[in-house]
Curated annotation (Swiss-Prot):
Organism: Aspergillus novofumigatus (strain IBT 16806)
Function recorded in the entry: Ketoreductase; part of the gene cluster that mediates the biosynthesis of novofumigatonin, a heavily oxygenated meroterpenoid containing a unique orthoester moiety. The first step of the pathway is the synthesis of 3,5-dimethylorsellinic acid (DMOA) by the polyketide synthase nvfA via condensation of one acetyl-CoA starter unit with 3 malonyl-CoA units and 2 methylations. DMOA is then converted to farnesyl-DMOA by the farnesyltransferase nvfB.
PANTHER family in alphabetical order: ALDEHYDE REDUCTASE II (AFU_ORTHOLOGUE AFUA_1G11360) (PTHR10366:SF562), NAD DEPENDENT EPIMERASE/DEHYDRATASE (PTHR10366)
Highest taxon of source: Eukaryota
Gene: nvfG
Position of the signal peptide: none
EC identifiers of the protein: 1.-.-.-
Family named by the database record: Belongs to the NAD(P)-dependent epimerase/dehydratase family. Dihydroflavonol-4-reductase subfamily.
GO molecular function, one term: ketoreductase activity
Record's protein name: Ketoreductase nvfG
Biological processes per GO annotation: novofumigatonin biosynthetic process
The protein's annotated pathway: Secondary metabolite biosynthesis; terpenoid biosynthesis
Length: 342
């Protein structure tokens, strides 16, 4: 990590929502490694989570707070006492086909967090975890965009489709998820512009996340699909190709940059390493685990993902801030996943 002035100094406490989640646990781990303290939100007691981080980083550096409702003002107010930065990774009420639940709920939660944080002078940075699906990379049929995606492009199609009666039922959960991120991200940036709080807000937009799972109790949708392939289960994602992948630890690095780097302000960070196909994934898994005869064949894929222009800037941030060569490769990402999951 680069030395110099950071928005949140080492030793400060960062709040990470959904700390027992796949991405949030990776972010928590990196923050602890860099000398920060973490207060993680969970929906119920997770003694294994406290034990995992305390065993590796000592007592007093990680704690959990139970928040069952992200719109609970009183609980949030208490949770933000002494907090210098927030990584809002959890997605409240995400997986529903009803947009009244799946879209409006998470948006209200984000605005609630911003409003409460504005009353705490200690908060200097907030980072929202979004998705590359908040940009217009693919349509409802999985076809890639025909024009390059830039940092001011939004997936307005998803917002429209979320409320349309003609949207196929099997697509609604994913569409609603993208729509919630579009609406939440856009309204958060507008809220900051309108209210001029004492903190900045940045947004990290991960692609299909692949990499190490820290603990057996941690799961993530993307890694469930990879583990399923190792067990001989064809993934439903064969029918829907995510346009880009990203290593989980690179996602964590970009969250840290968004929290700490003064020059990164009110930015959407496109966390996308490279396009991929399921044929590539299957081929690499077979190389990594040659004795595994269960891994199914992947279908032919002739689609060419869209060009995500801002991904280059995200990679440069990792190079400059962490001194790395760039994004982690798909092979290395899968290797770490197989090592921990096989």
């Amino acid at each position: 990590m680069t030395q110099g002035k950071h928005c949140v100094p080492q030793g400060s406490t960062i709040l990470v929502t959904g700390a027992n989640g796949y991405l949030a646990s990776a972010i928590t781990k990196l923050l602890l490694e860099l000398g920060y303290k973490v207060r993680g939100t969970v929906r119920a007691p997770k003694p294994w989570l406290n034990h995992y981080f305390e065993e590796r980083y000592g007592s007093g550096n990680f704690e959990t707070v139970i928040i069952t409702d992200f719109q609970d003002t009183d609980t949030w107010d208490q949770a933000l006492e002494g907090i210098s930065g927030i990584a809002h990774v959890a997605h409240d009420m995400a997986w529903s086909s009803d947009p009244n639940i799946a879209v409006r709920g998470p948006v209200k939660a984000i605005l609630n967090i911003l409003d409460i944080a504005s009353k705490h002078d200690s908060v200097k940075r907030i980072v929202l975890t979004s998705t590359i699906g908040a940009a217009p990379c693919i349509d409802i049929n999985g076809n890639p965009a025909t024009t390059p995606v830039n940092d001011d492009d939004w997936n307005d199609f998803a917002v429209e489709a979320a409320w349309s009666d003609s949207t196929p039922e099997e697509q609604r959960v994913y569409i609603n998820h993208c729509a919630a991120k579009v609406e939440g991200d856009r309204k958060a940036l507008q809220w900051v512009q309108d209210n001029q709080p004492g903190f900045d807000v940045n947004i990290v937009m991960p692609g299909f996340s692949v990499g190490r799972i820290l603990h057996a109790s941690i799961t993530g949708q993307s890694m469930r699909e990879i583990v399923g392939l190792l067990q001989g289960k064809p993934t439903k994602m064969f029918e829907f190709v995510p346009p880009w992948f990203i290593n989980t630890e690179d996602v964590a690095r970009l969250h840290v940059i968004a929290l700490l780097k003064p020059e990164v302000s009110s930015q959407r960070i496109f966390a996308c390493a490279s396009p991929f196909t399921w044929k590539e994934v299957v081929s690499i898994l077979r190389e990594l685990d040659p004795s595994n005869t269960l891994i199914p064949d992947a279908p032919d894929e002739n689609r060419r993902p869209c060009h995500v222009i801002p991904a280059t800037e995200a990679e440069r941030l990792i190079q400059d801030f962490f001194g790395r060569n760039g994004f982690t490769s798909l092979r290395d990402s899968l290797a770490s996943a197989v090592t921990k999951s096989a």
